[in-house]
Amino acid sequence: MKILVAYKRVVDYNVRIQVKPDGSGVVTEGVKLSPNPFDEIALEEALRLRDKGIATEVVVATIAPADAQAHLRNGLAMGANRAIHVVTDQPVQPLAAARTLLKLVEKEQPDLVILGKQAIDDDANQTGQMLATLWGRPQATFASKVEVASGKATVTREVDAGLETLEVDLPAVVTTDLRLNEPRFIKLPDIMKAKSKPLETLQLAELGVEAGAELKTTTYAPPAKRSKGVMVKDAAELVAALKQKGLL
């Protein structure tokens, strides 16, 4: 059983995001870039399935500029068998990402595709669903538990009413929630081994996919600064303050 894991590079979640002076985007030059936390969980789950003897190969893939090879080596150090780097300097929106992953699916013929339910840079939560639709295969999103047996994946997901369990035939697409697992710690020997693992490089144009934006963001702006809070002694003073501001 082969598992393909989508493994996106994003601005590290500890970085304080700065908007460019012209409002055209956020500053990414010189800031720390890290694997998308949801995709790390997806990779960890794929590795656990391999550790159990259910999967035989885990392939990690990313769509990113040429300098993202270190990012993929991180995935190889976690334990992936090999990596695929689809190179493009253009921003890739969810639909283009799904189309690119579909090309990799057609090339690799995986039994399962796992990716994070969303990326923390855009929070779109669209790529997995779009890939499943383009592929014509079942999907199970927001997975908090995954079991694979007899050509089926049983996925538990958290919904507003409690827990929901889905059973889907393989091949399928699964997107992961934060509660699914805790990614493993990468040890130094694993980092050294990753340097010799296969890493295939493809150009996005080779796959016949255009990275052009279907959705254009006209401008970016930081959140408006909040005004200083006002302390009140009791409910009556609170009501008076709200009336003064025209809120009541």
Predicted regions, residues:
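N-terminal glycine-rich FAD/FM-binding segment characteristic of electron-transfer flavoproteins
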Residues: 1-248
